[in-house]
Amino acid sequence: MNIVKDHCKNFKRYGEKRSAPLDSIQVHSIGTAQNSAKAVRDSMDQYNPGGIVHAVVDAETDGLVLELLPDDNLAWADAGYGNQHSYTFEIAESDFMRYKNGGAEYEVTDEEKFLEDIRRGYRNAVDFAAQKCLQFGIQPTAKLPNGLYALYSHNEGRLAGVSSAHVDPEHVWSKIGKTMDDFRRDVEAAMKEQEEGDGAGEERYLVQAGAFRNKENAERLAERLRAAGFEAFVKS
């Protein structure tokens, strides 16, 4: 993957750490007719944006992701649980669509090119989510105390009553026959491939950083280690 750091430093709360331990990854799609991560990033790089996430996955170029915020920063992603608990990212959609009536309804202006964009964005998102799950020690199908999966969509947050009333990204993935269950399965498969590729023929050594009676304290230490660039996970 080509992950490019292009931080939105004009955001008024840039650099502010989330107040809760990171326990999940929240997936969005942008909800506008745009396949360029750069265009999405530029729209968010303002003092008081309508929303801002940690990264944007491109739908125009294979493997391209723009990082907008440091991993440990809070986000303005879903007006709810995701802002303080989740690593959040958007997936660009397509230039070949037109939204109607100010909601999630849209029409496709060029079906072939639209499907190419959505499929490319999906593939990029699978690889990126797999990389972040490995980095944060997140299992996509693990369940959180609120009933959500540890890898969940904005729409799933809405259905669980912990996110704002958006239906992304399933409203565009339905056109390519994909669901969040498919996505989690694909991410788990990509995680396995990435682990095998990174560790093929290598012996690995694990270092324990601490032992805690309180899981929240353990999560805080793990998050500090991740922010410093280490791969960290909590295990009982």
Locate predicted features.
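Short coil-to-beta-strand
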Residues: 80-102
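Solvent-exposed beta-strand motifs enriched in subsets of small alpha/beta binding domains
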Residues: 196-236
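Basic/polar, cationic surfaces and motifs that engage anionic cell-wall
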Residues: 3-7, 14-19, 95-199
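N-terminal catalytic cores of peptidoglycan-degrading enzymes
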Residues: 1-85
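Residue-level signal for secondary-structure boundary sites
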Residues: 35, 63, 76, 97, ...
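Hydrophobic faces of well-ordered beta-strands that scaffold small-molecule active sites
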Residues: 27, 87-89, 151-153
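Glycine-rich, acidic and aromatic/proline-enriched surface loops and short helix-turn segments
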Residues: 60-62, 90-94, 157
